Amino acid sequence: MEDPAAPGTGGPPANGNGNGGGKGKQAAPKGREAFRSQRRESEGSVDCPTLEFEYGDADGHAAELSELYSYTENLEFTNNRRCFEEDFKTQVQGKEWLELEEDAQKAYIMGLLDRLEVVSRERRLKVARAVLYLAQGTFGECDSEVDVLHWSRYNCFLLYQMGTFSTFLELLHMEIDNSQACSSALRKPAVSIADSTELRVLLSVMYLMVENIRLERETDPCGWRTARETFRTELSFSMHNEEPFALLLFSMVTKFCSGLAPHFPIKKVLLLLWKVVMFTLGGFEHLQTLKVQKRAELGLPPLAEDSIQVVKSMRAASPPSYTLDLGESQLAPPPSKLRGRRGSRRQLLTKQDSLDIYNERDLFKTEEPATEEEEESAGDGERTLDGELDLLEQDPLVPPPPSQAPLSAERVAFPKGLPWAPKVRQKDIEHFLEMSRNKFIGFTLGQDTDTLVGLPRPIHESVKTLKQHKYISIADVQIKNEEELEKCPMSLGEEVVPETPCEILYQGMLYSLPQYMIALLKILLAAAPTSKAKTDSINILADVLPEEMPITVLQSMKLGIDVNRHKEIIVKSISTLLLLLLKHFKLNHIYQFEYVSQHLVFANCIPLILKFFNQNILSYITAKNSISVLDYPCCTIQDLPELTTESLEAGDNSQFCWRNLFSCINLLRLLNKLTKWKHSRTMMLVVFKSAPILKRALKVKQAMLQLYVLKLLKLQTKYLGRQWRKSNMKTMSAIYQKVRHRMNDDWAYGNDIDARPWDFQAEECTLRANIEAFNSRRYDRPQDSEFSPVDNCLQSVLGQRLDLPEDFHYSYELWLEREVFSQPICWEELLQNH
């Protein structure tokens, strides 16, 4: 039995592989033609047009609202409408909601809130559904989707002004503490959407209010803007001695992951948590504004550019070429012919750079010729999440598709200017001067960067250039201040910490932060498309699976689309939430950022993200797991169509899925945040063989995604070896063209790696010690501090009033015998000392 041809090879069959002399020569043209046709097909399959994607805080308003609901919930829209209309007819005669004056609408809402305060769960649920119908835009009285969105926003502001959010917050506390619902869900073999009805209604109302009020528009009246700021303050700070709202949602996430509440609608919880954090702390553009303000407060020079605008102006690069596998090597001309071509061509060219010389040395040599290393399993350094879930697959990586590049030497065309201003750190200048002084004068001057005596003129010019591009980050200032506070705690006094929303959130999360991070990563792992179904993994489909499983094929297809969409939305919310937390904590204080980062790394976040990208990212980004006719608000205006193959396949004609591309970019940004300037974590990227995984993501022609992939490749380039750099020159050129340069950063060569053995464990331990010292100094307030003043006056101490517990007099004689009479006391010496 003949072995099947290797996947992706273009070699001829057994009779044309070179065996048998003349037969092989006769079959060569056919084999070459077959290889060319296969190559054309593969080029067409991987060709991706430039994606017109605009990165932002979130998707469009309608899309963000529609993702709140699963398609299984669509039948509940009519249920909400019926509950509202039944209640409305008993209170208002002969009018519809939109016909009422604002005062009458407010009076009706007050009546609804009063009717929520009943003992019966069924009656309470009906009234809550009526409130949800208002928040959904009273779609029964609207003619278009625009009207539904308009009245949804109007009603949400009205509901907030009447105190609906605080009322629903109390109901949410009751449902979270409802032990009967938890025990009922635990007893069931399979939890379905029916087990979380009350929670889904409450969370939906709260999400609609947060999302609609969060959205700012120029036409908003003054009252709405005031209400928005008041709402933001209520969500940010502890009200009535209660924790901030985000902490309540975090506790729901941990309770769900611990298995104590499997019926929680986790998608709605995560969406609401993400939007609350974004609303209270600010989105990505607001972060840039805060960064500019903070630099001005610290007396630092302004930023050289706005990173968001620079990325938006970038153009996507063509993906690098890939291996042509066995077919190319079989059909390539003999080396002697190549040498002849190379020699004749060199006679015509007098000046060539090293890249052109390298390309001409072997015209058929494309990137990644040695695929043995990259085709090894990405799970060689296999890790587990909480000891139960594999984080790296053991299946071999899929070989890269054939090259798109023509079989000729290519020249790399660089733009006129690089997009980023180069940066230099203070320690880079110190390191440069240390090497220069050792070379020219034989000794060093420590951290002195001003004394240049004895150094040649070119070194003077180099130092001048380095200082012109010196960049002092906010983190550098914060670390320096922290070192001074550790050295001189008494003389510098107590640090004044402003009570910002970010600071309050960190204080609330501090002691449970490891559990929060592990819970989020567990859910992210369960939602990743590369995850394998396991019996011991958490069930994230409780709020999407119907009570009765589908019977027909079409119903199964619909549920399959719904489940995939459900997972995509969870990935989107978690990735954006983690990125927002990291960026805000980094701006607030660098050690807050490092604390969160370290717990993410300890929970195996790095291999988890790499596992996510160990799939066909192009297919994931272009996946169409949506049914447009079932999306809100479209499904509320039109009658639900009969389930057919056409209605399932009917959807938007966009070339990509916004949320999936958004998730991929955020996960790459998250990975970049965790590994930047951390050699131990960069080595994790190398150990887990991330280079081929990341490089395949470059096939997606979107500038921002490519930028963060190239950043991650740049981090580990020096560790990948000379052969990898030689065979990936186009990737190296793309890094040079798109990623910011650090002067005297030897990223492309790695000459000093062997001379610099990193103690990775010591690096993380030192960072952890600094974090613990920061948290202890700022947030631990022990009563008997070593820095608190001591009262040495005997009379003063004896005269102090000491509050004793009420039951102390029962054991007073025993205490007197044990602590006073049985202890030898030299009274003369005691009196002499005082």
Swiss-Prot record:
Q: Which domain of life is it from?
A: Eukaryota
Q: Name one GO biological process term.
A: regulation of cell shape
Q: Which residues carry this modification: Phosphoserine?
A: 318, 329, 354
Q: Where is this region: Disordered?
A: 1-48, 321-345, 360-382
Where does it mainly reside? Answer: cytoplasm
Under the heading InterPro entries, the entry gives:
Far11/STRP, Far11/STRP_C, Far11/STRP_N
Assigned keywords, A-Z: Cytoplasm, Phosphoprotein
GO cellular component, alphabetical, reads:
cytoplasm; cytosol; FAR/SIN/STRIPAK complex
Composition bias type Basic and acidic residues, residue spans:
30-43
List compositional bias (Gly residues) regions by residue number.
Answer: 8-24
Q: Where is the composition biased (Acidic residues)?
A: 369-379
Cellular location of this protein? Answer: Cytoplasm
Q: How does it assemble?
A: Part of the core of STRIPAK complexes composed of PP2A catalytic and scaffolding subunits, the striatins (PP2A regulatory subunits), the striatin-associated proteins MOB4, STRIP1 and STRIP2, PDCD10 and members of the STE20 kinases, such as STK24 and STK26. Interacts with CTTNBP2NL.
Record's function text: Plays a role in the regulation of cell morphology and cytoskeletal organization. Required in the control of cell shape. Calmodulin-binding scaffolding protein which is the center of the striatin-interacting phosphatase and kinase (STRIPAK) complexes. STRIPAK complexes have critical roles in protein (de)phosphorylation and are regulators of multiple signaling pathways including Hippo, MAPK, nuclear receptor and cytoskeleton remodeling.
**Family as reported in the entry's similarity comment:** Belongs to the STRIP family.
Q: What is this protein called?
A: Striatin-interacting protein 2
What organism does the record attribute this protein to?
Answer: Homo sapiens (Human)
